[in-house]
A protein has these predicted regions:
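A structural motif
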Residues: 25-38
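Short, well-ordered alpha-helical segments in soluble proteins
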Residues: 7, 35, 63-67
């Protein structure tokens, strides 16, 4: 038995807390578009481009309640009853917080063979116009120093200049990583998985 999570909404940016304020003018007919944080053509079948302000506010309220519940369950040892969790998360996800997945969930889990799989940025191609300089070191700031109570797998470039990908795994309770070639390459126009 295992729980599989794909880019779980454990946390969102703190800006979402105030997104309801951005929608206030929408009560006036001339400002109806203010009910949306962004309005764009829906060209991406895997992600909504337009996003209503109320959805951002509700996402913040939901994740705040979820984090409170996880913390309480951790203190009361209820998380010990969970089966192992396996999470797939992009380090560059701009919709949900990768940091919250680690700090609010994984760092509270007991030792139970849980694993987080993180997809790193494609370091072989520089997307300077799209990304902040800090994006290239985001993953190193995301994880606590090993040993950890959960397995950590990172899918990244073999070297910063290579599009060849590898898997770097640090098992729970260990500090040494195991490196394995994937036999795959990042596409030149992909900055993250």
């Amino acid at each position: 038995q295992r729980v599989i999570l794909i880019s779980p909404m454990i946390g969102v940016t703190s800006f979402a807390r105030f997104s309801g304020v951005a929608g206030w003018p929408s009560f006036l007919p001339a400002f109806a578009k203010a009910a949306w944080l962004t309005i764009m053509p829906e060209f991406n079948p895997f992600k909504f481009n337009s996003f209503p302000t109320n959805a951002a506010r509700q996402s913040f309220l939901l994740t705040s309640a979820l984090q409170t519940q996880i913390a309480a369950d951790s203190r009361n040892k209820k998380l010990d009853q969970l089966p192992p969790i396996m999470t797939f998360q992009s380090a560059m996800d701009s919709t949900v917080s990768a940091r919250a997945v680690i700090t609010a969930l994984y760092n509270r889990l007991p030792v139970n063979h849980s694993e987080v799989v993180l997809f790193d940025l494609n370091h072989a191609v520089r997307f300077n116009a799209l990304l902040r300089r800090s994006s290239y070191t985001a993953l190193s700031r995301l994880l606590p120093t090993p040993p950890r109570r959960y397995d950590t797998t990172i899918i990244t470039n073999v070297t910063a200049g290579s599009t060849e990908m590898e898997i770097r795994t640090i098992p729970a309770g260990k500090t040494e990583q195991i490196v394995e070639k994937m036999g795959l390459r990042y596409l030149p126009d992909v900055y993250s998985l």
